[in-house]
Amino acid sequence: MDVMRSVLGMVVLLTIAFLLSVNKKKISLRTVGAALVLQVVIGGIMLWLPPGRWVAEKVAFGVHKVMAYSDAGSAFIFGSLVGPKMDTLFDGAGFIFGFRVLPAIIFVTALVSILYYIGVMGILIRILGGIFQKALNISKIESFVAVTTIFLGQNEIPAIVKPFIDRLNRNELFTAICSGMASIAGSTMIGYAALGVPVEYLLAASLMAIPGGILFARLLSPATESSQVSFNNLSFTETPPKSIIEAAATGAMTGLKIAAGVATVVMAFVTIIALINGIIGGVGGWFGFEHASLESIVGYLLAPLAWVMGVDWSDANLAGSLIGQKLAINEFVAYLNFSPYLQTAGTLDAKTVAIISFALCGFANFGSIGVVVGAFSAVAPHRAPEIAQLGLRALAAATLSNLMSATIAGFFIGLA
């Protein structure tokens, strides 16, 4: 029954996308079908097949080992505030976001910058990009951008496509925006993992977002023009570093900007939510609903969607609330509020944990529209009106991609 509910959830999400399509007659069943199959296959390999699960677990273990080294830099700056005795001192509440999550982002961004400099990232992106281009029958630039989102965030995509921005047709531009919103960057992935989100789920979600973003981009805005972009040499940065030291330093400074942005936005929105909840609770108290909150309202509204995705009805309000927080605010705030349930074993069943983890894994939120419009407009001011028109539709496509990955994850966890 649960498995059939997951299948129903996939059908519901595809139906929503079809209804939102701007040109239903031009939908390519070849691309859409291949993207859906590939998204399911990646989920099955990493979540259900024993060899795939083994590889995912080993990679997750390696990521955790690498993350642990970030504590060395944190301890040098913050001393015992990142030590193991903090949990004992504060009775299990010694995890300090600013001392554990933000330094990890800086460390990993510097590490990724080094890997770009020595060519490792370029090789991976070219190999994966070629595979997805042929499998999905899409243009090279679409495949290139989609695969790059595994490592880079939506803020960096405009710099990647800048040399070709004038030759991108409307569909390619839309796909690039969708891919950025549907994914997460490698640096922020480490931040989510530090909050307790299973790394193997984050890895699987990142890979599934590649075909998922393309799937819903092509459903909502089918390709109607041929690609005009032709290139052999792909560049990942406008001014490549001249040494490995410069690469590390540049990456660290970029990581600092990301960490500062994360801290600022999280602090601001947590405060705003607290204010809104205070107002809602105060007004609700007049009518006997003193415990009403923004989370509870959003949870009730999205609970049916969470249920059809595979979440048990008893947890549907929580799942709906977290999905709503991710959409209205951002994924970091949603993961931050999800974290306490991950720290306490047995609070949620494995399937619910998987579905929520996948559903929140993406940059798709209303704030991202402003980020995308601002970032793309900076490199192509003359296309700003066009980009602004695509923003809301891209948000819908990216959100559906995240929810589809979550539904597929629930399907395979239910089979395990």
Where do the language-model regions lie?
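Interfacial/capping segments of alpha-helical transmembrane domains
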Residues: 45-81, 227-230, 276-301, 314-322
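Hydrophobic core segments of alpha-helical transmembrane domains in multi-pass membrane transport
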Residues: 10-20, 35-47, 105-114, 183-191, ...
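Juxtamembrane inter-helical linkers in multi-pass membrane proteins
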Residues: 126-160, 226-247, 294-298, 326-327
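Alpha-helical membrane segments and immediately flanking helix-loop junctions
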Residues: 135-193, 320-408
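Hydrophobic alpha-helical hairpins/lids featuring a short glycine-rich hinge
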Residues: 68-138
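Transmembrane helical segments that form the transport core of multi-pass membrane transport proteins
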Residues: 253-344
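Structural signature of hydrophobic alpha-helical transmembrane segments
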Residues: 1-11, 100, 292-294, 356-366
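Long, contiguous bundles of hydrophobic transmembrane helices that form the permeation core
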Residues: 207-258
